[in-house]
From Swiss-Prot:
Residues 1-26 are annotated as: Disordered. The keyword Transmembrane helix does not apply. Its main location: nucleus. PROSITE patterns: ZF_C3H1. Keywords: DNA-binding, Metal-binding, Nucleus, Repeat, Zinc, Zinc-finger. SUPFAM superfamilies: CCCH zinc finger (SSF90229). This is Zinc finger CCCH domain-containing protein 5. GO terms for cellular component: nucleus. InterPro entries: Plant_ZF_CCCH, Znf_CCCH, Znf_CCCH_sf.
Length: 466
């Protein structure tokens, strides 16, 4: 290294010797060339073109070399250090001077933002007269350009990755719009002084029918819903109406309305069967007079509209190109609702969904028939004792309870199985007391239906009066 250092210190002569060996160019590119003579830079400057009217080659100012060589169209000054200081050190392309090309179109990006991401490599004109107009920014710091299109990214997300240099319009994001009124305004109603809760006098009682009223004391108000906000009557056919009845003991009780054909009749507490089918109310089903059904075209030669077959309607209306069978256009106003709340249409096609699952997701709006062929009880019965309710296990047949009578001959007889001896006397726990006591003493499988007389190795045991 000492001979090379001496040669470098020799000035121009050393530079010429190193050029012959080929080491001068390599050392000059690495920025190690120096000395008083500066022969390395003089040689490099002589090889690269000097164009005083053009912008300085940024790559040359950074590295001291240019890959384009003599074909580079930019200026390569001999004093590279001084040119780098004038151009801001030559660290970024944005700090370089933008070229002026009078014969070329004006750079739109430069005219809007005052900068150009292509720098000196841009092929458009960048006038120096400061023709860049000041751009107004919105509250978020993004430019407002009324004549341009809205920035789609900003409209969707509220942000823009280009910031103030974006060439699109960024409108002000307005405040949150007021929520539209989903419910009608509540009108003040007169308050009755006899109501236990005067501020809730205009509201309607609402309590699940499965919750007995005896669990809630009269001093606690039940859940109430204003009738103007949530209509309780008839808004959903699957929910039975609720009737508020005040008991004499001070407790508020709730009695369930018609459910599966049950209804309250008369002042008695017994629940009897009502009518078999409930008529369809106008609140749950629009009538033909108030709303006329759209006419769907019948095209026998075309495939059937699957959406129409499933829902009974077609969103395309008369413009639909598929076939709409006319037998599905049954009037809705003349149908009846079954105890399940589903329409009965004897002349229509049975609902396939109801046939498979036992219920219909379309409810009373379904246009198909929902037959009630699976109900085994008689809706014309007049007493709740005739309900098909088994107080004991269903696989055990127990004799029905006989009416009370003073005669001992009318008492029911229970037969014991062969497991008990004929000479064994019945214990008091089995012959006296109600049927529940007998069931506690003997298992249900040991009891069979009563007979008038014993037969075939079986012993008759007389029960007590029930």
């Amino acid at each position: 290294m000492e001979p090379y250092a001496a040669a470098e210190g020799g000035g121009g002569g050393g530079g010429g010797g190193s050029t012959d060996t080929g080491l001068e160019e390599s050392m000059w590119r690495m920025g190690l060339g120096g000395g008083g003579g500066g022969g390395g830079e003089a040689v490099a400057a002589g090889r690269l073109p000097e164009r005083p009217g053009e912008a300085d080659c940024v790559y040359y100012l950074r590295t001291g070399a240019c890959g384009y060589g003599e074909n580079c169209r930019y200026n390569h000054p001999r004093d590279r250090a001084a040119a780098a200081v004038l151009n801001g050190g030559g660290k970024t392309t944005h700090s370089a001077e933008y070229p002026e090309r009078p014969g070329q179109p004006v750079c739109e990006y430069y005219m809007k933002n005052g900068t150009c991401k292509f720098g000196s490599n841009c092929k458009y004109d960048h006038p120096r007269e400061g023709s860049v107009q000041a751009v107004m920014l919105n509250s978020s710091g993004y430019p407002l350009r009324s004549g341009e299109k809205d920035c789609t990214y900003y409209v969707k997300t509220g942000h823009c990755k280009f910031g103030s240099t974006c060439k699109f319009h960024h409108p002000e994001i307005g405040g949150v719009s007021e929520t539209p009124n989903m419910y009608p305004p509540v009108q003040p109603q007169p308050i009755s002084s006899s109501h236990p809760y005067q501020h809730l006098a205009g509201w309607q009682m609402g309590r699940p029918p499965v919750l007995p009223g005896s669990f809630l004391s009269g001093s606690y108000p039940p859940m109430m819903l204003p009738s103007t906000v949530v209509p309780m009557q008839g808004w959903n056919p699957y929910i039975s109406p609720v009737n508020q009845v005040a008991s004499a003991g001070g407790h508020q009780t709730v009695q369930a309305g018609p459910f599966y054909g049950l209804s309250h009749q008369g002042p008695s507490a017994a629940v009897t069967y009502g009518s078999q089918y409930a008529p369809l109310s106008s609140s749950t089903m629009p009538s033909s007079s108030s709303k006329q059904e759209p006419a769907f075209p019948a095209r026998p030669g075309q495939p059937e509209c699957q959406y129409y077959l499933k829902t009974g309607s077609c969103k395309f209306g008369s413009a639909c190109k598929y076939h709409h069978p006319q037998y599905l256009n049954t009037p809705k106003s003349n149908c009846m609702l079954s105890p399940l709340g589903l329409p009965l249409r004897p002349g229509s096609q049975p609902c396939a969904y109801y046939t498979q699952h036992g219920f219909c997701k379309f409810g009373p709006t379904c246009k198909f028939d929902h037959p009630m062929g699976t109900l085994s009880y008689s809706p014309s019965a007049s007493s709740i004792t005739d309900l098909p309710i088994a107080p004991y296990p269903l696989n055990y047949a127990v004799a029905p309870v006989a009416p009370p009578s003073s005669s001992s001959d009318l008492r029911p007889e229970y037969l014991l199985t062969k497991e008990f001896s004929a000479n064994q006397s019945a214990s008091p726990g089995t012959t006296c007391g109600p049927a529940g006591a007998m069931l506690k003493a003997y298992a249900p499988h040991m009891l069979i239906r009563p007979q008038t007389s014993g037969a075939g190795g079986m012993v008759t045991t007389h029960g007590g009066e029930l």
